[in-house]
Amino acid sequence: MAYAAERYITVIPEIDLPGHMQAALAAYPELGCTGGPYEVWRMWGISDNVLCAGNDKTIQFIKDVLAEIIDIFPSEYIHVGGDECPKVKWETCPKCQARIKALGIKGDSKHSKEEYLQSYVIHEAEKFLTENGRSMIGWDEILEGGLAPNATVMSWRGEAGGIEAARQQHLSLIHISEP
């Protein structure tokens, strides 16, 4: 971090959640909807195995990981991912469905109740970061189901996510992957 700071470089860490957590689930299978076992993937991909949004231990795990990131990285911003999180396990998970019921979450014509459940997880992460003096960045999927109040949206699927974030009075970054 000192090397970067000496060169006026801000390192913004990214920890992807609640999806892209296959390795974490292999280490902590109780944080998944099925309890595992889970294998660490050796190749990139999108797994249906994601953090269980209905498990209180999951929310604490997220806060613990973010606390460690805060200790290591002085950046004002921390990227929480929020992309590519299949909801298929949440649809049948008793804990996730109980959380949906407890929060009074309802699906609508735009978003499923599970998409709103992901918004709950992202809001919890954003609230923790704000309480600790940091700002959250997330991929444009965090727009689905309601955006955390102080979030910055990094749109990787085109300009539509960035425009929608701006409409909602949020900072937005548009990632251009093609020349």
Language-model segment annotations:
Residues 88-89, 138-168:
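Substrate-binding cleft/loops of secretory-pathway carbohydrate-active enzymes
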Residues 174-179:
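Residue-level detector of conserved catalytic or cofactor/ligand-binding positions
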